[in-house]
């Protein structure tokens, strides 16, 4: 049995999306048990619509719901100990839950997670890792917005953690890892990127295969299993990809409705277009993982629908089932030991 705590008030639609999404996840994974946190007047009526889910879940009342526009410092002051977001995270800390899922305010969720759960040993900064659809299937990209800027050591930690996540989700024994850069040549890029690349070259690991620098157009190609960057660049890349996907979908819709012949062609190609739409649907790959914390926290997109929230829950489920935290902690310890040994010999 896997226990997942849910911030039922998170996201643009709160319980109206969160609870149906959890119900979908429960249908697919009957061994999940949920603990919902939220305002009783809003959560209980929605939960009552799903009797099977309600029977297999627990509801705990909260006093405060964190707003999507609240500043992290404001959210910490107002919500510590009594908000649905804080209580869902705290359930992981106390062992009541194995993972937490929230569609709430990203900054507040990260601040509360760091304050409540603390960081893994030897990890200086957390990263948000996202699943990215590619021509080869899916890749992991991190950091997509946890922090602005990262030094060489932090980028290397992201590489090790991202590779651990890839092994857990994709069942790849030795994921390929690339550092996002302005070119693939070794002389290009910022000093911290070049230094991180040198560290990864000098410290071979069983758990990942370093493939060098990759460019922005390599992300969608699926050139590597894990793309590593700092949060400022990663978030811009994410938002650009989301905007491009929406633009392409709209341009395609316009082209297919422009003439009678185009409309007829659309009818015959409907199956192919439906498969393309499903491939590009952000709800299918929803769920950013906060890596580097001493507990599992999953961030769902605030505007996700029920299917999207279900996807985020499933990411958390897979993380727990595959013992992600233990594996990442072991990988980091092994890497830091190996790197210190290589450095001392140098």
From Swiss-Prot:
It catalyses: a fatty acyl-[ACP] + phosphate = an acyl phosphate + holo-[ACP]. Pathway: Lipid metabolism; phospholipid metabolism. It is found in: Cytoplasm. One of its GO terms (biological process) is fatty acid biosynthetic process. Catalyzes the reversible formation of acyl-phosphate (acyl-PO(4)) from acyl-[acyl-carrier-protein] (acyl-ACP). This enzyme utilizes acyl-ACP as fatty acyl donor, but not acyl-CoA. This is Phosphate acyltransferase. HAMAP family: PlsX. Belongs to the PlsX family. Homodimer. Probably interacts with PlsY. The keyword Zinc does not apply. Keywords: Cytoplasm, Lipid biosynthesis, Lipid metabolism, Phospholipid biosynthesis, Phospholipid metabolism, Transferase. It comes from the Bacteria. Pfam families: FA_synthesis. Its main location: cytoplasm. GO terms for cellular component: cytoplasm. Its EC number is 2.3.1.274. InterPro entries: FA_synthesis, Phospholipid_synth_PlsX-like. PANTHER family: FATTY ACID/PHOSPHOLIPID SYNTHESIS PROTEIN PLSX (PTHR30100), PHOSPHATE ACYLTRANSFERASE (PTHR30100:SF1).
């Amino acid at each position: 049995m896997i226990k997942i705590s849910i911030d039922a008030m998170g996201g643009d639609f709160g319980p109206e999306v969160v609870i149906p999404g959890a119900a979908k996840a429960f249908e697919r994974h009957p061994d999940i048990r949920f603990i919902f946190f939220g305002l009783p007047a809003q959560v209980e009526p929605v939960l009552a619509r799903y009797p099977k889910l309600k029977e297999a879940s627990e509801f705990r009342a909260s006093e405060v719901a964190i707003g999507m526009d609240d500043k992290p410092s404001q959210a910490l002051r107002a919500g510590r100990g009594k908000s649905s977001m804080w209580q869902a995270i705290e359930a992981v800390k106390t062992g009541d839950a194995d993972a937490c899922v929230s569609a709430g305010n990203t900054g507040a969720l990260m601040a509360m997670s760091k304050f409540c759960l603390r960081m893994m040993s030897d990890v200086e900064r957390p990263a948000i890792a996202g699943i990215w659809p590619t021509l080869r299937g899916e890749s992991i990209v991190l950091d997509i917005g946890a922090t602005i800027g990262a030094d060489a050591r932090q980028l290397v930690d992201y590489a090790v953690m991202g590779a651990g996540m890839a092994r857990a989700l994709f069942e790849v024994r030795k994921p390929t890892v690339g550092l996002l850069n302005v070119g693939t040549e070794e002389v290009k890029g910022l000093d911290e990127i070049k230094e991180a690349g040198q560290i990864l070259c000098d410290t071979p690991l069983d758990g990942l295969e370093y493939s060098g620098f990759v460019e922005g157009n390599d992300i969608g190609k699926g050139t590597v299993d894990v793309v590593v960057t700092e949060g400022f660049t990663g978030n811009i890349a994410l938002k650009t990809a989301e905007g491009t996907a929406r633009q392409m979908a709209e341009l395609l819709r316009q082209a297919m409705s422009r003439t009678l012949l185009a409309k007829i062609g659309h009818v015959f190609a409907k199956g192919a277009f439906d498969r393309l739409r499903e491939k590009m649907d952000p709800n299918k790959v929803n769920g950013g993982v906060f890596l580097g914390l001493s507990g599992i926290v999953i961030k769902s997109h605030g505007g996700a629908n029920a299917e999207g929230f279900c996807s985020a829950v499933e990411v958390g489920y897979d993380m727990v089932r595959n013992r992600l935290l233990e594996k990442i902690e072991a990988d980091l310890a092994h890497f830091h030991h190996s790197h210190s040994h290589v450095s001392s010999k140098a």
